[in-house]
Amino acid sequence: AKHVDALLDGLRFDAKERPRLVHRLDKDTSGVLLLARSAKSAAMLGEAFRSKEARKVYWAIVAGVPRPAMGRIDLSLEKRPGRGGEKMAADEEGKRAITDYKIVANAARRASWLVLEPVTGRTHQLRVHCQAIGTPILGDGKYGGKDAFIEGDSPISRNLHLHARGIQIPNPGGGMLEVIAPLPEHMVKTWRYFEFDERDEAEPFLEWRE
């Protein structure tokens, strides 16, 4: 698939300026991606993220059940060379990375549906943080290895089960604008397999965060 940057000219429509990416998603992550139609709006949205006024929330299926059921992962990350390319790794001398999470549902001890809200925006942050607490995201062989896959006769896709579910940004007209993205097909099938119900998480943003 073409990188998103290569598609931006096609999203210009009648605007004089080329759209700008406000943030990025990992190559295999689905969901909401925010574009700015002008340099001015890009600057405003960038500041909204820096000030934590704008928020992003992700859904993931992880292998196992994290403990506690709700918490904050505060683990600094650093980029390191590795087999198959560079990887992010926990490193006290790295850049601070913080993720809030909570369990929505779990399938015994096999897997859990998590809501993840990154407080910082480091590369591969959610993937490394989930692996660091012993529950790698399903399909994330890069960080979870074989533990990121449910073996046997399971029909679960081997694709990454990480989805940018929603984004919340200031509305220039007042209040907040919230955009929700539907799950991709492979994750819909996994939800059905585990008998999870999307309606169980009616409020996608974590309101318990300090």
State the predicted function of each range.
Residues 62, 100-103, 137:
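Conserved hydrophobic positions within beta-strands
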Residues 91, 118, 171-172:
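Short, acidic, Ser/Thr-enriched surface-loop or helix-capping motifs
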